[in-house]
């Protein structure tokens, strides 16, 4: 069971943003959505989609005031300086009775040290694991917990609240065969709503540049066997592979880029184009843009010949 707690960290967002995030989350293969009382009060008048909801409350009186949730869990202040490695919480049902447990891993613990402990917890009943990402192992802890037979994990989009990133957990479960995706993941709406989150271009799963490749040998390898360099196809996350042209590019990169834009100029000297691309990239101290490449090919491959004609299927420099 995958629980997403992204909304718990959007209390200062507008009600519209909170609702849009909720709707975007329901399009992903998650099993429950957790939110705070503040967020719920903001969106309660809107039509909430059918879903299991967990409410993060301040005290037991909130359980009486907000009936109908799948579970309730009390908000806590985590003391990072505590000697404890984890905190155990009770999860309540709508009648206020203890129904499950949650363990928040708060210390700098690694997967290697937790496997045996996970097995012990699993034998002791229904348990939700909330691994925090203090040493960049939250995703690994979440995956290992579920692989060992754990029931549920708490995640958040892009690791909000120092949680295991939702997108990384979903993709890890897919590539390891624990929980296969039935359709591609689309995080575009989540990224739009969470516009104040700084997402690195190389952030796993959702980074804009994770399928960008420049090195000639890598481009050649991807053309022959994408699985050598990509753990999953870009289409699985609603993305596309992008060849970047720069001083690390090779002949395969030029050929692939020509094919990408359906550039037809008779006999094209790809070696000459590659030399110019590398020099231009070196002079500019950056990769050259697709527009610059198309103009370059037009200048080199078609100048002075009426018979040579560039066909732009995706692009037009005019």
Q: Which residue ranges define each predicted feature?
A:
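Catalytic alpha/beta core domains of metabolic enzymes, predominantly
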Residues: 110-228
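N-terminal small/glycine-rich loop or linker at the start of catalytic domains
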Residues: 1-15, 115-128
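Glycine- and other small-residue-rich loops at beta-strand/loop junctions that grip anionic moieties
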Residues: 10, 35, 104-107, 129-134, ...
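Active-site beta->alpha loop and helix N-cap motifs at the rims of alpha/beta catalytic domains
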Residues: 32-113
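A mid-to-C-terminal "edge-of-domain" accessory segment
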Residues: 4-8, 22-26, 184-318
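Divalent metal-dependent hydrolysis catalytic cores, especially in the metallo-beta-lactamase
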Residues: 3-5, 29-37, 150
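Alpha-helical scaffold segments that flank or form the walls of functional sites
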Residues: 17-31
């Amino acid at each position: 069971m995958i629980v997403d707690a992204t909304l718990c960290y959007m209390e200062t967002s507008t009600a519209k943003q909170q609702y849009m995030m909720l709707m975007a989350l329901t399009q992903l293969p998650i099993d429950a959505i957790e939110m705070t009382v503040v967020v719920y009060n903001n969106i309660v008048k809107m039509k909430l989609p059918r879903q299991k909801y967990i409410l993060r409350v301040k005290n037991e009186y909130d359980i009486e005031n907000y009936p109908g949730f799948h579970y309730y869990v009390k908000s806590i202040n985590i003391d990072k300086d505590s000697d404890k490695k984890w905190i155990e919480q009770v999860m309540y049902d709508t009648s206020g009775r203890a129904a499950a447990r949650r363990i928040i891993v708060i210390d700098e613990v690694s997967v290697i040290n937790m496997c045996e402990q996970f097995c012990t917890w699993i034998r002791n009943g229904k348990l939700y694991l909330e691994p925090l990402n203090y040493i960049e192992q939250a995703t690994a802890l979440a995956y290992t917990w579920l692989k060992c037979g754990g029931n549920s994990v708490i995640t958040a989009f892009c690791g909000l609240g120092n949680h295991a990133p939702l997108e990384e957990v979903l993709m890890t479960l897919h590539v390891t065969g624990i929980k296969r995706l039935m359709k591609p993941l689309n995080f575009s709406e989540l990224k739009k709503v969470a516009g104040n989150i700084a997402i690195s271009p190389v952030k796993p799963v959702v980074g804009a540049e994770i399928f960008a490749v420049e090195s000639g040998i890598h481009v050649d390898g991807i053309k022959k066997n994408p699985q050598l360099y990509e753990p999953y196809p870009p289409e699985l996350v609603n993305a596309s592979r992008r060849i970047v042209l720069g001083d690390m590019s090779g002949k395969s990169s030029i050929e692939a880029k020509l094919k990408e834009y359906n550039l037809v100029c008779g006999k094209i000297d790809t070696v000459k184009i590659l030399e110019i691309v590398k020099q231009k990239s070196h002079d500019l101290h950056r990769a050259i843009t697709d527009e610059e490449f198309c103009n370059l090919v037009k200048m080199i491959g078609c100048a002075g010949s009426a018979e040579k004609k560039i066909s732009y299927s995706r692009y037009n420099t005019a």
